[in-house]
Amino acid sequence: MLRTIDYIRDWTKEANKDEAHVEPSLLNFAVTDGSTVVVSRYITSKTDEAASLHFSCGSSFVETSPGEYRVERLDRNQDVIMVASEPLTFERGDWTAVPTNSILTIKKQTILLHPIIDEYYQEDPLYLRSSTLAESKGLMGSIPLAKAVEKNVPPLEREGRTRPPTAVAHIA
């Protein structure tokens, strides 16, 4: 993946060498060999934000009401791992943003994040990149917000689901 990004970056520089102003290249793409998935979130800029990329993992992906979903985490297993340009659920905690100029690797139940260290690498982790370019192209959004969470309502009921009758009997 890193070599592919290097090739594309170098070819783009060569193709644009006579241009006065060159817009950064946004390179979000995924490759797989059938057992491992490698995904990039990359931009040829040290100051701009790349197009957004998020991932979520858990035990299952459940529909809480028609058209609304959430990731369920019943244990520490990561049976479901999703990668998307934008969060697919209204639960902010369901999604983790992949940092700009990073590689996300998924192999079985293991998720690894690695920075791409090249001329566009930003050493300061607190540096705020500009999202203007990605937003102007419609390539960056935000996590959707759901309605306010009711206090004192257990999580399953808050999602519109209920516990099996046997579980309720054991709790009482």
Give a label for each model feature.
Residues 1-172:
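Conserved short alpha-helical segments that host acidic/polar catalytic motifs at enzyme active sites
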